[in-house]
């Protein structure tokens, strides 16, 4: 998530990316270990700090929800199409997205790391996991036995958020996922950046998360998380991911990032152009013609590289699965530990739940704006929305009108409500 605003700034200290495997290899075909069958093993029951949103448990009261939706003048929404739908918006032509009915298995992996007795100790990450697990169970029907909680206050060694345990749990989350399954990933802890080694980042840095034993085992880079949790998914599988961490804007390496207006973002060449022009003007004012030329050439190369990286990522990291990621900050921003209503919590995790409690009937872009509104009065971080495929018409639902399925309108958890 974060760092403490008062005593710990600037993000977590970066380390060179260690291209090492965990002590044990976790193949997809291996059975999941017993502790991942239930989160009760060595873990206290979650605190019920966040109650269900008004209207009760949506996964148990579908008819009641539809009645309230119809009162808004939207009519009875249709079901999503059963056939694959072409992406468009610059996505590779060979890909097609399949809508998920989300009637299958629900599984969740939630990781919260306070880094006890370490530099940069946090206070709210474990509370984030407790609050989120309760919210998922009470409002969207995620079974307790299908949740894995990794927090560093647990006695069971397999429930500690070590690098090996986190990687193993990531494999567990996506193992045997089938169309219409709903998977959920939540990380609250330190994040950072490290130099990009494979050329897939337009800013030259990979995003990383820090396990509790990162000093010994190293961090986990975004490329690896994408390979484990996104690549194996079939069309029709839903994965919702939340990263409450610093520098987390592209923590899953999803190629489609959306603005608060619902516009697909391109590489920020305008910003680069302004910086490049400023450098050229400064060099000209100094009479340094050599520097002026080198600055202009450097900008051109950087802008060209950014555009090439963006196009390459669309070709290699687009997915037919439905992967949606909400992150606590942009790649160049930090996220905050917060004290809200007497409880230490991650600002992003709190804002996410708070926004949905106030209005569970939001589109993607509405929820992104709602989360930002929750944070705007106290924090400078700007949450991001990124996807494995273009959202198209899914990004925005008008306040008035019909023809949009309620399956879409529920935004981040919409498919969990269709059980």
From Swiss-Prot:
The keyword Electron transport does not apply. This is Metacaspase-1A. Residues 59-71 have a biased composition (Low complexity). It comes from Aspergillus oryzae (strain ATCC 42149 / RIB 40). It comes from the Eukaryota. Its EC number is 3.4.22.-. GO terms for molecular function: cysteine-type endopeptidase activity. It holds the Pfam family Peptidase_C14. Involved in cell death (apoptosis). Residues 41-51 have a biased composition (Polar residues). One of its GO terms (cellular component) is cytoplasm. GO terms for biological process: apoptotic process; proteolysis.
């Amino acid at each position: 998530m974060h760092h403490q605003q008062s005593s710990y700034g600037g993000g977590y200290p970066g380390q060179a990316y260690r291209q090492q495997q965990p002590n044990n290899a976790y193949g997809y075909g291996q059975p999941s270990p017993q502790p991942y069958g239930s989160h009760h093993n060595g873990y206290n029951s979650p605190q019920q700090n966040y109650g269900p949103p008004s209207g009760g448990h949506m996964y148990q009261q579908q008819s009641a929800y539809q009645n309230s939706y119809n009162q808004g003048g939207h009519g009875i929404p249709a079901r999503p199409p059963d056939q694959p739908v072409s992406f468009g918006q610059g996505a590779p032509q060979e890909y097609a997205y399949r809508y998920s009915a989300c009637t299958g298995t629900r599984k969740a992996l939630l990781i919260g790391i306070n880094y006890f007795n370490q530099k940069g100790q946090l206070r709210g990450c474990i509370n984030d996991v407790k609050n989120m697990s309760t919210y998922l169970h009470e409002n969207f029907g995620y079974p307790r036995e299908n949740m894995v909680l990794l927090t560093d206050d647990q006695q069971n060694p397999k429930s500690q958020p070590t690098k090996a345990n986190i990687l193993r749990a990531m494999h567990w989350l996506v193992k045997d996922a089938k169309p219409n399954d709903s998977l959920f990933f939540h990380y609250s802890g330190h994040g950072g950046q490290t130099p990009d080694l494979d050329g897939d980042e337009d800013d030259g840095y990979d995003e990383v998360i820090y396990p509790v034993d990162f000093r010994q085992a190293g961090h986990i880079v975004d490329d690896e998380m994408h390979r484990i949790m996104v690549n194996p998914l079939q069309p029709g599988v839903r994965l919702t991911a939340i990263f409450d961490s610093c520098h987390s804007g592209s923590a899953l390496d999803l190629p489609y990032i959306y603005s608060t207006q619902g516009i697909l973002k391109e590489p920020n060449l305008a910003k680069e152009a302004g910086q490049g022009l400023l450098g050229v003007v400064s060099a000209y004012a100094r009479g340094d013609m050599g520097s002026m030329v080198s600055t202009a050439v450097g900008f051109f190369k950087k802008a060209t590289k950014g555009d090439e990286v963006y196009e390459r990522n669309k070709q290699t990291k687009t997915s037919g699965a439905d992967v949606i990621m909400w992150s606590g900050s942009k790649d160049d921003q930090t996220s905050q530990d917060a004290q809200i209503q007497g409880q230490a919590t991650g600002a992003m995790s709190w804002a996410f739940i708070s926004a949905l409690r106030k209005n569970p009937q939001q589109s993607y872009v509405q929820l992104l704006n709602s989360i930002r509104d929750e944070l705007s009065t106290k924090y400078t971080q700007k949450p991001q929305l990124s996807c494995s495929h273009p959202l198209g018409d899914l990004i925005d639902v008008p306040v008035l009108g019909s023809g949009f399925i309620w399956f879409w309108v529920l935004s981040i958890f919409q498919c969990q409500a269709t059980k």
